[in-house]
Swiss-Prot record:
Phosphorolytic 3'-5' exoribonuclease that plays an important role in tRNA 3'-end maturation. Removes nucleotide residues following the 3'-CCA terminus of tRNAs; can also add nucleotides to the ends of RNA molecules by using nucleoside diphosphates as substrates, but this may not be physiologically important. Probably plays a role in initiation of 16S rRNA degradation (leading to ribosome degradation) during starvation. Phosphate binds at residues 86, 124-126. It catalyses: tRNA(n+1) + phosphate = tRNA(n) + a ribonucleoside 5'-diphosphate. SUPFAM superfamilies: Ribonuclease PH domain 2-like (SSF55666), Ribosomal protein S5 domain 2-like (SSF54211). Keywords: Nucleotidyltransferase, RNA-binding, rRNA processing, Transferase, tRNA processing, tRNA-binding. It comes from Nitrosococcus oceani (strain ATCC 19707 / BCRC 17464 / JCM 30415 / NCIMB 11848 / C-107). It comes from the Bacteria. Its EC number is 2.7.7.56. This is Ribonuclease PH. The lineage of its organism: Bacteria, Pseudomonadati, Pseudomonadota, Gammaproteobacteria, Chromatiales. GO terms for biological process: rRNA catabolic process; rRNA processing; tRNA processing. The keyword rRNA processing applies.
Length: 239
């Protein structure tokens, strides 16, 4: 039995609130159960030095957690003078995922930065950040289309992300903190609308997993991501 009482294949309640902040070109509050992340997409007329003269743009991400987004207060990384390894790894993960569904040449010489701020953490913050960032990115691009800055969208696909794992010997979908902290296996999966994998991150914690368990987790991930993709499509269809 999962601590939440959910079935192994059951997602937490998922909600997207678009246009959550006033100034960003795209903004969403994404909620995976009690995990809540604000994703802001900002478009700037600059590109990394290595792209100068190529005509291509860039998609990048920054990720952070509010000090009291967790059970006990964490110190701000800014106060410590540097970002931690986990933070750097997660923001690279988010950026890589989003670049997989964007034509950077069609984007033009701009940088879109996805700022993902975790205001409450209960497991799955990086997967929520990726799933919410896609919605914010679409809104940012639609903003440029509406202003006729660009004539067609550089986004050529859709994506979402979810966690899966093995909890008390059972493959489960969308782990919350209580499950994630004691799971035998924890995995993060990103897939597109065609059912193809963009990234898989998986680690065994004490007990190695077998091929049949891996397949069971990937099947759960595909099912959950299909639900997330449908919810993204539904929320983006609204004004």
């Amino acid at each position: 039995m999962r601590p939440s009482g959910r079935a192994p294949h059951e997602l937490r309640p998922i909600h997207f609130t678009r246009h959550y902040t006033r100034y960003a070109e795209g903004s969403v509050l994404v909620e995976f159960g009690n995990t809540r992340v604000i994703c802001n997409a900002s478009v700037e007329d600059r590109i990394p030095r290595f792209l100068k003269g190529t005509g291509r743009g860039w998609i990048t991400a920054e990720y952070g957690m509010l000090p009291r987004s967790t059970h006990n207060r964490m110190g701000r990384e800014a106060a410590q003078g540097r970002q931690g390894g986990r933070t750097l790894e997660i923001q690279r993960f988010i950026g890589r995922a989003l670049r997989a569904v964007v034509d950077l040449a069609a984007l033009g010489e701009v940088t879109v930065t996805l700022d993902c701020d975790v205001i409450q953490a209960d497991g799955g913050t990086r997967t929520a950040a990726i799933t919410g960032s896609y919605v914010a990115l679409v809104d940012a691009i639609n903003n440029r289309l509406k202003k006729r800055i660009i004539t067609h969208s550089p986004i050529h696909g859709q994506l979402a992300s979810i966690s899966v794992g093995i909890y008390e010997g059972t493959p489960v979908l969308d782990l919350d903190y209580r499950e994630d902290s004691t799971a035998e296996t924890d995995m993060n999966v990103v897939m597109n609308e065609a059912g193809a994998f963009i990234e898989i991150q998986g680690t065994a914690e004490g007990h190695a997993f077998r091929m049949n368990e891996l397949q069971a987790m990937l099947d759960l991930a595909k099912s959950g991501i299909n639900t997330l993709l449908a919810q993204q499509t539904e929320v983006l269809a609204k004004n």
